[in-house]
Amino acid sequence: MAITGSAAPSWPRLLHAEGPPSVICIRLLVGLVFLSEGIQKFMYPDQLGPGRFERIGIPAATFFADLDGVVEIVCGTLVLLGLLTRVAAVPLLIDMVGAIVLTKLRALQPGGFLGVEGFWGMAHAARTDLSMLLGLIFLLWSGPGRWSLDRRLSKRATACGAR
């Protein structure tokens, strides 16, 4: 039974990849940061992987640190390649919101992160996370740009649909 109408997935729209050539700069940097962060969770488990997750109070720290590392490696690579970019951005967005909530909002409490209290301490601590969050929202909204595998897939899907 074929899916028709509004229930049918719109792959050409999901893969749509136009926009200025400069989008590649954002996509490559966002993908590279997530890929490198994911790899580092396995290279330095005490500082960035399960050890860090335990220190901030995450239950089942090894499981969640490994899951986080795999998500960052896989989705970071997809973003880097411009392949299923919008799909890959969603788990990374969830990852960043979780990182901000679990590690940065504590700075709003007295004596919080870096011993700096209040909003400015949190803003300082969260600057990289917020920048990555903004980059992911941009890619989710605009797509991966002209120089991406999504664009090639989109052209192919559009050509197949025109037949």
UniProtKB/Swiss-Prot annotation:
Domain of life: Bacteria
Membrane topology summary: Multi-pass membrane protein
Name of the protein this chain belongs to: Uncharacterized membrane protein Rv3486
Residues annotated as transmembrane: 19-39, 63-83, 87-107, 119-139
GO cellular component, one term: plasma membrane
Family of the protein in this entry: Belongs to the DoxX family.
Keywords attached to this entry: Cell membrane, Membrane, Transmembrane, Transmembrane helix
Localization per Swiss-Prot or TrEMBL: Cell membrane
Pfam families: DoxX (PF07681)
Organism: Mycobacterium tuberculosis (strain ATCC 25618 / H37Rv)
